[in-house]
Amino acid sequence: MTSNAGEGRGLARSLVLVLGIAVLLGLAGALVGMRAFAAQAPPEELSNDELLSRVARATGDPPAFSASITVEQSVLPAQLLEASGQEGGPPALSGPLSARVWYGGPTQLRAELQGENGDRIFVRNGSRVWIYDGAENTVRTGEGVPEQETPDEEPVTPTGVNRLLDELAPTSELSQQEPVEVAGRQAYVLVLSPRDEGATLVDRAQMLVDSETYLPLRFAVYADERPDPVFSYQVSSLDVGPVPADLFDFQTPPGAEVLPLEQGAEPREQERPEGAEPTQVETVAEAQRLVDFRIRELPDPPGDRELTGVYLKNGDGVVLTYGSGWGTVVFAQGQGDGDAAMPPEAGDAEANGLQQLPTVDLGGGVEAQEISTPIGSGLSWSADGVGYVLAGSVPASELEQAARGLR
């Protein structure tokens, strides 16, 4: 594994972790092409907690449906996304990605994706999986990851939703706007925004929710002072009802090469080892007793943020957090060349694109790879046998200043 590859992967994973608050809560599209209801009656008035409860129940057990979807992003650079792609997986989201999706149940799914790097088709029917790569004219097929035998999940309760809202309340404001029409359907509009606008580059996140099925129809994340979303997921058409069974019977295209399905083409979450999640400890001194390298604290954190958390990762890495909520800055470190925040399943194939990331001089002969995006930035570097990753929803210049303070 090369130093640059490890640094870039660690940077990418940490940056995604920090920015994930916005993308995961994610949350709905630009209002272009939408209109408030005039002729139609507005949907039932719901409180925030009741609407969130219905969304959680609907996404946990969705009805059969077919939909046309478009995803766009201008957050991460194309070479990083292409480098982090996986063989047999979906095309990297370096440009608009259009997809047609048919869902017949937990083990019946068909997705046809159109991207700049060629079309892909993914089909699951029972335990059988097919993945077609139009650019290579290859089909990978085999038994997919089996359904896990787990007890039924507890239903979403008002208490659970209220607990979530209580956790969000100190740093975030959740509100509803006037209902709109999207994809010919009535939709609720939820808006999540940071209370401390100066602590983050994220302006707001929005979600449009279908008033009939309570499935999300659009998501978007907006950066500060930018009118267009930097990440958006949009459903342009949605048909709810039974899906023809023959859509889940994959027909191999003429001349296509058929190859065995590799487990690497399945979701990487299946590969995560036990203990992969960070474990919080009380102090830096306690963490220092458990690792074999010197833990560094930021002498000049961005925006004078205070140390708010100390975490052990995979037994040989440490993650320090500064600040809270949307403005959290993460400082990960561990023995090796930039692998402090890198999950063990990442492979060497990512190196080529990662080497193209820009570098900045931190002084003392140390250079860092840098990602700068509209909603956050990240640095990754190595010094004296220790890899470091610094990331947060702050300008890159603030991270550079904090990193130089370590010299």
Stretches with model-predicted labels:
Residues 75-96, 266-386, 393-401:
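Short, solvent-exposed recognition patches
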Residues 98-158, 228-232, 379:
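An acidic-aromatic
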Residues 2-23:
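N-terminal Sec-pathway targeting helices
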Residues 64-68, 105-110, 184-191, 215-218, ...:
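Short, hydrophobic/aromatic-rich segments at coil-to-beta transitions
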Residues 57-82, 107-111:
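A short, Trp-centered hydrophobic/proline-enriched beta-strand micro-motif
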Residues 6-8, 26-58:
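C-terminal region of N-terminal signal peptides and the immediate post-cleavage residues
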Residues 112, 175-259:
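Gly/Pro-enriched, hydrophobic low-complexity segments
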Residues 208-213, 220-221, 227, 239-266, ...:
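Extracellularly exposed regions in secreted/surface proteins, prominently low-complexity, repeat-rich
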